[in-house]
Every structure is written in structure tokens, then in C-alpha cells.
Amino acid sequence: MNETPKPNSFRSGPDEDGRFGIYGGRFVAETLMPLILDLQDEWNKAKSDPAFQAELKHLGAHYIGRPSPLYFAERLTAELGGAKIYFKREELNHTGSHKINNCIGQILLAKRMGKTRIIAETGAGQHGVASATVAARFGLPCVVYMGATDVERQAPNVFRMKLLGAEVKPVTAGSGTLKDAMNEALRDWVTNVEDTYYLIGTAAGPHPYPEMVRDFQSVIGAEAKEQMLAAEGRLPDLVVAAVGGGSNAIGIFHPFLDDSSVKIVGVEAGGKGLQGDEHCASITAGSPGVLHGNRTYLLQDGDGQIKEGHSISAGLDYPGIGPEHSWLSDIGRVDYVPIMDHEALEAFQTLTRLEGIIPALEAAHAIAEVIKRAPKMGKDEIILMNLSGRGDKDIFTVGKILGMGL
């Protein structure tokens, strides 16, 4: 899907066991192992199948609306007075975020495997909407597991999923957020392995999911690289993206990993601060452990019990991160930094006011980091940020906090 990485490349992982260094792998129930191996086999065939790639490209152009534009944020750049700021406009995709890139790829795989039922987990509802969308497009039934807390704070997306014909199952276990939804989806999958395809929405889970999701999302970085060379004649100095599970981030990061002149920063959800437990900064404040089929950085207590975490953004409210991010952090290729709720909220308003773009709260975390860094950089330097989703789904959350009832 991308050009072949060099042997000593940062882009050559994972190995045949799905590991990025000590991270990744396949930690799943025995009943799932044959299915996982089957999926991996099908994925390996699809990667080198010109017909699969052609269909993916066709749907990308005619259904998703790719390539998404590269946009120079003129007023934000002027306001901050430093580096030139460019956005990769993934919020302009069909369904309003980067999630659809992966969903189209995976549903084509599900069809190749003869699966007749789709299940998915969702936090902010963006992946749920994208899954329900592709299921409708290909005429397959779809069940979406969503934490009860998220069902409440993401009402517009719940309605969209139902309109699209999906069954939304609220999950009340734990804190009723993304982790709990993923647990329920895995339970469903174990019970219905024969006919069901689990469409995971982030670059985590058991191998081959982290690799698969990354490859489907790498179209973001590959396009951005070409577009940046066309616009500026060179690569950016800095690439920034928000990181929850990490699919939009790995999608824009991966094509730039071997470009040593490009600094890369992933922005985690700092929530209400790193001192307590009300954040989702797995790399900044977590430790390695196993969750949802892979080894990665997690928010856990001394006994290895998973902490609940918190973020203003439902899509970043996950106590882990994709294993490739854990590895990239350990080897020092990517820096991961936290942004607090209040900073994201401020950035959300700043972008809306200056550029007429209402960003998703997830992307607002990345914008907040850009707002911090741009003024410290030279006017001849360039920042590329992944604007991963639009903020329609977040107006209720933001309205409530700002005291503007909707």
C-alpha cells in the first residue's frame, strides 16, 4: 500500500508475530486464534491483490471523496506569528472523519472472507457511524457496541447509526466508555466466530489489526506528503496528530517515519491533569501491559487492573494506545505529549473563530499543541497537522461546558 520500506527502516514492522519491539502480538482466546490466523492470511493475500487495491482506490475516490485537501490555515498562522500551519482535511471525508478509510478496507476483507455480520465498537461514535455506513453500502447487518456514557454524550451519532440500520448496544459495565464497548464486542466475536467480522476502529487489538488499520489509514500521510511537496516544494518540519488508540496519528505519521528531517508529535488526552486518574495519557503516564489482545502502554494500577481514565473527548477516552505508538515512543522517533481538557476546548473555539472550521474535540487536542509550538518556530518552518474529524458531534458537549444550552 506504501512504497516498500528499507530493511533498517522505522516502517518495516511488525514482525511475523505482529510485534513492534516488545509491543503488539496476539493475546486472544483459543477460540479466536484460528479466525485471527485466517484473517492474517486473507490480509496478506489482499495486500498483494491488484483487484483488491483497485476496488479500495475506487471507493476511496468515489465514496469517501479522496484525496482530502491539504489546507493552509492562513489566519491561524498569522495570529500565532510563527510557522506556517497546514491541515490535512480528513474531516471532509464521507461521514466526517478519518474512520471511513479503515472501514472501507476492512469491509472489503470481510466480504472476501465470506462473513455475513459486522460488529464494531465505538467511543465518539465516529467509527460506529463509519462501520454502519459501510455495512449499509454492502448490505450487511451491523451491531455497534457503545459505552452507555458515550451513548449519552454522543446522541447525534447514535441517531445516525440507527438511521443507517445498525443496532446500537449500550454497554453499562465499567465506566461505560470505549474500553467497555471493546470488551463486549470481543465477547460477541468469540460467541459468533463463524459468520461475524469484528471491524476494529483503531490501530490496536491483536495482530493483524494494528498493521491493517495503519495501512488503510496511511493513505492520509501518503497523500499529505505529495500535496506538501506540490504546495511548498519540501516536507514539513513538524507533523502533529491527536492520539487515542492512534489510527489517525499512525496514518499520517507512518509515511514520514523515515524522513529524519521531520519531527513527529502525538498528542494524548491530558484530561483534568496527570496528577490524578482523570486523563487518558497512556504513554506519558502509563506503563506496558496487555489489553484487548495486544501488549502496549496502558493506564493501570499496581496490580495491573485497568484504570478508567477520562477525556473531554469521547474518542480519546481509551486507557491504552496502539502498539506501534508504544514502540515509536520507546525508540524516540515520535514524542508524545499531553493536552488538558481546557486547552483542547480553547483550541476548538480558536480554530472555529479564525478558520471557520469546527473541529472534533479529538483534533482540538492536536490544534492546542500546534498553538503552543507554532509561535516558537520560524516563519519559514512548516507544521502539518491531521484534522481528523469535524465537530458537529461535539457541539452538545461544548455547549454544556460553555453554559449555552442547545
UniProtKB/Swiss-Prot annotation:
On this chain, the residues bearing N6-(pyridoxal phosphate)lysine are K99
Give the classification, highest ranks: Bacteria, Pseudomonadati, Pseudomonadota, Alphaproteobacteria, Hyphomicrobiales
Family the entry assigns = Belongs to the TrpB family.
Q: What does the record give as the reaction this protein catalyses?
A: (1S,2R)-1-C-(indol-3-yl)glycerol 3-phosphate + L-serine = D-glyceraldehyde 3-phosphate + L-tryptophan + H2O
Pathway terms, separated by semicolons: Amino-acid biosynthesis; L-tryptophan biosynthesis; L-tryptophan from chorismate: step 5/5
**Function noted in UniProt:** The beta subunit is responsible for the synthesis of L-tryptophan from indole and L-serine. Essential for production of nod factors and establishment of symbiosis.
* Subunit structure, as described in the record: Tetramer of two alpha and two beta chains.
| GO molecular function terms listed in the Swiss-Prot or TrEMBL record | tryptophan synthase activity
Question: What InterPro entries is this protein classified in?
Answer: Trp_synth_b_CS, Trp_synth_beta, Trp_synth_beta/beta-like, TrpB-like_PALP, TrpB-like_PALP_sf
Tell me its cofactors.
pyridoxal 5'-phosphate
Gene Ontology CC annotations of this record: cytoplasm
Pfam families xrefs: PALP
The name of this protein is: Tryptophan synthase beta chain
Native organism is: Rhizobium etli (strain ATCC 51251 / DSM 11541 / JCM 21823 / NBRC 15573 / CFN 42)
Look up keyword Lyase and say if it applies.
yes
Q: Where is the signal peptide?
A: none
UniProt entry keywords in alphabetical sequence: Amino-acid biosynthesis, Aromatic amino acid biosynthesis, Lyase, Pyridoxal phosphate, Tryptophan biosynthesis
